[in-house]
């Protein structure tokens, strides 16, 4: 008999990639995340953070307002003992010293800087008890990217043994190991 999680993932993938008319209320169904009157990317990031056991964020650009949008949830996670890792860069000189100082105040998040040329990643990984989820797309950790701008992001969920999450985490770890602590 198939594991309940695997069955749920199969049904979610079938709805997301084969037949949109299938009934499936699972939170594992792939989703297009956009900013409009009905939804925004920030809400999806917060929803994933609220349910995760750990998280990894890789973004080129971060603003103080973007960080402020998540500060409460980051503090809540800290009180629950949930830790995260964040990689960013000095690409195009966008990130400010004040923003870096704000990042350093987040006790449960390790922060590193990469010097990879042209670093322009936008990836969010959330480890949950039985599965992982990821948001991959065009949204940096800025208030406008998460709430206002026209952005395309995909929310995908995967079994912890899935190849996609394995490869994404490997990319993150290689980048992490070759980055410097903030």
Residue ranges and their predicted role:
Residues 1-182:
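PLD/PLD-like phosphodiesterase catalytic module centered on the HKD motif
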